[in-house]
Regions:
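Short, well-ordered loop/turn sites that connect or cap secondary structure elements
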Residues: 2-5
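Short beta-strand-centered aromatic/proline hotspots
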Residues: 17-28
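Short aromatic-glycine-enriched beta-strand elements
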Residues: 21, 32-37
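Intrinsically disordered, low-complexity, charged/polar segments
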Residues: 41-103
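Short helix-loop-beta junction
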Residues: 136-147
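Proline-aspartate-enriched helix->loop->beta-strand connector
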Residues: 164-177, 235
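Catalytic cores of nucleophile-dependent amide-cleaving enzymes
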Residues: 199-246
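C-terminal functional extensions of proteins
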Residues: 245-310
Length: 310
């Protein structure tokens, strides 16, 4: 369609207008075809499409699309917060029982006011500045301490060592956009993916400094990423086993589950997958110990939870 320009919201006619995209750029291919470079509005997908396959979306349709996505995401965030509170109560009860068996007294059962929580600290490196801003807001909603940085996928391997050394997180997120190339070809080749090779390089850079899954939990990937290669490089969790799309907030929901699982408990991939927006086939990984610790005593001067961008 003529008149489509960077910043427009469009949908692909050949895919039944199933996903809305933002136009990043319009280029002319070697074959002389005017083609739009696209990024998903709510999924972490990079794609391209000829202009004649695109339909510009009116403002009211975009508003409705965004409203539906916000409503869906809020239901997952609400469930995560409810799970946090239930885990907190269970953890305090467990400590009451442990204290009783040792002949000590922590306080009245279920009291817990003297304790404070230390969930796992997150370093979120994102190849999409808009998604990073949305994720930082969501991290605040989920009470997760995070440092966030916009770093293009191609540059992440070069920035990660310095960021890891500076912020020493418990959990590292390496994400942005990905997707199978239009030619696809051999799905066991990194060349068939737009950014999987960049995520692999970033994972390896991180693992040279922090080789243990127990020391540093890594989530890596985006839509249709080369799941097996990411795990082999050292990711704890990765996308996408079934080469399907993942939601922009799926990495964050994985992180929340790990960050708020107590250190004496193991969190499994099966548990994590059911908490993601996209669900089965989107994400997988290996079991890992949680990162939540309780501290004592609480102090009005302690301020652990923050979401900041670099």
């Amino acid at each position: 369609m003529a008149g489509i320009k960077p910043g427009d919201i469009v949908a692909r006619l050949s895919y039944g207008k199933d996903i809305f995209f933002k136009v990043k750029a319009v280029i002319i291919t070697d074959q002389g075809q005017r083609t739009a470079l696209l990024k998903g509005l709510d999924v972490r997908l990079s794609a391209d499409a000829p202009l004649e396959d695109l339909e510009l979306q009116p403002a009211e349709q975009v508003l409705f699309y965004r409203h539906q996505d916000i409503h869906r995401c809020n239901s997952y965030f609400r469930r995560a917060r409810e799970r946090q509170e239930a885990r907190r109560e269970a953890y305090l009860t467990w400590m009451d029982v442990a204290a009783g068996s040792e002949g000590t007294q922590r306080g009245a059962p279920g009291e817990g006011e003297g304790f404070f929580e230390l969930p796992g600290r997150v370093l979120h490196v994102d190849g999409d500045a808009e998604y990073l801003d949305r994720c930082l807001h969501a991290y605040q909603q989920l009470r997760l301490p995070v440092r966030g940085f916009f770093v293009a996928e191609e540059e992440q391997a070069f920035r990660v060592p310095e960021l890891l050394s500076r912020y020493t997180p418990d959990i590292l997120v390496l994400t942005g956009h990905d997707g199978l190339t239009r030619q696809k070809g051999d799905m066991s080749s990194l060349d068939s993916y737009r950014h999987s090779k960049d995520f692999v390089a970033a994972i390896r850079a991180a693992r040279r400094l922090r080789p243990s899954h127990d020391d540093l939990v890594i989530f890596a990937g985006a839509c249709q990423s080369y799941y097996e290669a990411l795990l082999e490089a050292g990711a704890t969790f990765a996308s996408s086993p079934a080469r399907i799309l993942i939601h922009a907030f799926d990495p964050l929901l994985v992180v929340e589950r790990v960050a708020y699982t107590p250190i004496h408990e193991t969190v499994t991939p099966q548990e994590i997958i059911k908490d993601t927006i996209t669900g089965e086939g989107s994400i997988g990984g290996v079991e890992i110990k949680g990162k939540l610790r309780l501290g004592y005593p609480a102090s009005p001067h302690l301020r652990f939870l923050s979401a900041t961008s670099g």
